[in-house]
Amino acid sequence: ANARATLPQVDVSGVGCGCDASLYLVKMKDADRFGPNYCDIQGVGGSAPCAEIDLFEGNRQAIASTVHMTQGTGADGTCNQDGCTEKWGEHETNTRGELVSELYGPGGNIDTTLPFQVAATFYPDGTVTIDLSQTDYIKDKEVRVRFYDSERTGNRGGIDSPVSPEDRARTAAALGDGMVLVSSLWASEDLSWLD
């Protein structure tokens, strides 16, 4: 059976460019023990890198979701530290040529001046999909946008390609072993990878 996780309602209306509101899963060891057990794919704070699934990283103008299962960088087809990612906001259009400002942002299909839902579905083979949804009370309908799909986020340098079977297997194993949900809000002078 597929596992579906609906995350807390997201409100980024006050989160501008240069800021990153994040919800992500990490393969944290000994998560039930008190102490310095935090880890992520980048090895922050000197910790050993661990598997990470960025369910939502964003602000009112940009959004990214990324699966990171292995070390390494570059568009080499693996879900490495750069990751198997979908990003909207860095460019005017996404990889399918759709205008990002119409899909996500103030006044977009997902209007970031209002709260919205983020829902992730994890399939037994390690496929991940992430949907954004929002109720449009004026038009009395729910708007749903498929944001992330393992079928088109295979880290091939901006080309739609599927995540490899090996990385799907790693994702399934990490999820099967259990991961910890982490939230953060941070700012940087250089968030060009997102904004």
What is each of the regions a protein language model found here?
Residues 1-195:
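GH16 jelly-roll
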